[in-house]
Amino acid sequence: MRKNRIIMTHGINVNAPLLASYVNGNYNVELYADGTKIRFGNVDEFKPDFPENIDVCITRKCDGGCPYCYEGCTINGSHGLLLDGNGELINWMQSLHPGTELALNGNSLDHPDLERALILLREKGVFVNMTINQMHLAPNFAKLLDWQRKGLIWGLGVSLVDSESDVFYTCIKHFKNVVIHTIAGIITVEDLINLQSIKPKVLVLGYKNIGRARNYSLNHADEIMHNIEELKVNLPMFIANEYFSGVCFDNLAIDQLDVKNLLFKNNEEGWNQFYMGDDGSHTMYIDAVEDRYAKNSCMSKEERYNINDKTVDEMFKHIRDTYVNDSETSPEVSEVSSDESKS
């Protein structure tokens, strides 16, 4: 869930407009229009009171049929609750803090209450990043563009399916703050070479061996491992030659690709600036369909907890108390992430 990307120290000029500036616990956060986020503070360790980013599954209804879908979405899947009986945001959404980023995953476009919820979230100062499957981009092009222009969605994540689609490239150039979502083990080197023509931001997600992805990995284990090894070989070259305007990873991809040794070998300072922290330290996951929350979307059923009437602060405190150890980020290092929606 966590995205880690190219580093920027606080004080360096950021050309993009400042979207939000807020205090979270004992440190400050600045969020910029290009997806850059900077944390800074004169403290021994950063201790947030609320999550900066929340991955949210609002529906499991999707006609994409991806064989490696970790959420197990189907055409007959259920929607999560977003609004109460009065057409207002449900309790946990009401408790969100201004500046918080929500990453809506799955085929969120199919949710009947989505637009109303987006309007209310915008009024609260919450930034919504939406991830969609590439197959849903062209059919919903006008709607998505209108929502972004109105500020209902901030970032758009597009899960890559076909890197040779002319329609995809025609549509994508009209959006700002777009991140192309790829999956380690699924994405090929050829796909990344094709993407280079538009020089996008690219998010590499780890392969989540849950949901339908578990069965897919059993039948395609060699292919998945081959793609991961090929990515390891070529990733340093892609970054050094600036194939993309930015490359970021979630923590699972960092482990699977051994990013620390691959890109930061003998560069502990660079790694400390790059790494945004463990899942649960500044982030969490909410399953609005099942009304449960967890450290991240990979957690087992036993490690997903009922929301009931909890606020986001209460859920996040539980996550941190349960999973986060005493080792936090050095206050002398400002951290940057590029957050769009997570898949």
Label each residue range with its predicted role.
Residues 296-343:
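Membrane-interface junctions of multi-pass transporters
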Residues 65, 105, 289-290:
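Residue-level recognition of short loop/turn positions
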Residues 53, 72-84, 97-111, 121-140, ...:
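Core AdoMet radical
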Residues 88-91, 113-123, 143, 167-170, ...:
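Alpha-helical scaffolding segments of alpha/beta enzyme cores, especially the outer helices
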Residues 1-56, 73, 268-271, 331-341:
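N-terminal [4Fe-4S]-dependent radical SAM core
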Residues 36, 67, 291-292:
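Residue-level signal for well-ordered, solvent-exposed loop/turn and beta-edge residues enriched
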Residues 44-85, 297:
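Canonical Radical SAM [4Fe-4S] cluster-binding loop centered on the CxxxCxxC motif
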Residues 152-310, 315:
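Radical SAM enzyme [4Fe-4S]-AdoMet core and its adjacent flexible, acidic
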